UniProtKB/Swiss-Prot annotation:
GO terms for biological process: ribosomal large subunit assembly; translation. This is Large ribosomal subunit protein bL20. Pfam families: Ribosomal_L20 (PF00453). Belongs to the bacterial ribosomal protein bL20 family. The keyword Ribosomal protein applies. GO terms for cellular component: ribonucleoprotein complex; ribosome. GO terms for molecular function: rRNA binding; structural constituent of ribosome. Keywords: Ribonucleoprotein, Ribosomal protein, RNA-binding, rRNA-binding. The gene is rplT.
Length: 123
């Protein structure tokens, strides 16, 4: 059986890691063993933060909606409940965008939710 020399695959694997470590400081950019540790940790951070980004943006949208709704005398929780009563199915991302960029349309939605809330409390 022929002898298998592993230099080609090792070099390719090392090049791949060094390429991922481009832009790092010190030995992290050109020393394979250090670069491998740094790249693995960077990938862990990336995996974690892809999930954290979703949480962060949802909380940001909620803060923006809450701030915009309080200008019209409503609480965030009442506003969300009023949306469900009024059968308005806009998500928080769209509502937050409207609160920042389309204040007139957002005011109309707030008025609709106020009407739905008063109807539910009266009848």
């Amino acid at each position: 059986m022929a002898r298998v020399k592993r230099g080609v695959t090792t070099r390719a694997r090392h090049k791949k890691v060094i390429k991922l470590a481009k832009g790092y400081r010190g030995r992290s950019k050109n020393c394979y063993r250090v670069a491998l540790q740094r790249v693995e940790k960077a990938l862990q951070y990336a995996y974690r933060d892809r999930r954290n980004r979703k949480r962060f943006f949802r909380s940001l949208w909620i803060m923006r909606i809450n701030a915009a709704v309080r200008q019209y005398g409503l609480l965030y929780s009442d506003f969300i409940y009023g949306l469900s009563l009024a059968n308005i199915t806009l998500n928080r991302k769209i509502l937050a965008d409207m609160a920042v960029h389309n204040k007139d349309n957002f005011k109309q939605i707030v008025d609709l939710t106020k009407e739905a809330l008063t109807k539910s409390r009266v009848g």
